[in-house]
């Protein structure tokens, strides 16, 4: 994945699965599989994860879509569903997306989801933009 730190080895995959299981145990949410309706094929993941941003707990909308399906609106559809779930079911006051500045396609998804740049942060030694949307500022779609 182009904007992900690095591909995971076997141990990294096991740790990633364990981390996601813990997220469900602790927060009752995490990442969900993205399944293409027309073929029932796994095409990515999306969901809500708790992130530490400058010492503050934030709920992040995240998404990963298989590269050959980029540009078809799948990430936007998934991000909007996550946004609605976060506000309606989790009653979050704010949702964020952490995005590398050069990841223009992901930035477009965040903007289509009603998000705007809130601040800049460093994560894993790399600059990231924190896109955010507040529940009290409804989105016009």
Identify the role of each PLM range.
Residues 1, 6, 18, 31-141:
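Acyl-donor (CoA/ACP) binding surface of acyl/acetyltransferases
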Residues 9-28:
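Active-site rim helix/loop that mediates acceptor-substrate recognition in acyltransferases
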């Amino acid at each position: 994945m182009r904007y992900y730190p690095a591909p995971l080895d076997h141990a990294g995959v096991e740790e990633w699965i364990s981390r996601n299981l813990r997220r469900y145990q602790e927060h009752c949410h995490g990442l969900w599989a993205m399944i293409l309706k027309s073929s029932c094929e796994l095409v990515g993941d999306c969901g809500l994860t708790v992130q530490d941003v400058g010492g503050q707990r934030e709920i992040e909308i995240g998404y990963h879509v298989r590269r050959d399906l980029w540009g078809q609106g799948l990430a936007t559809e998934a991000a909007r569903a996550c946004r609605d779930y976060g506000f309606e079911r989790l009653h979050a006051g704010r949702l964020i997306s952490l995005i590398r500045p050069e990841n223009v396609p992901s930035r477009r998804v965040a903007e289509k989801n009603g998000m705007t740049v809130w601040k800049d942060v460093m994560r894993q030694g790399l600059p990231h933009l924190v896109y955010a949307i507040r529940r009290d500022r409804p989105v016009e779609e």
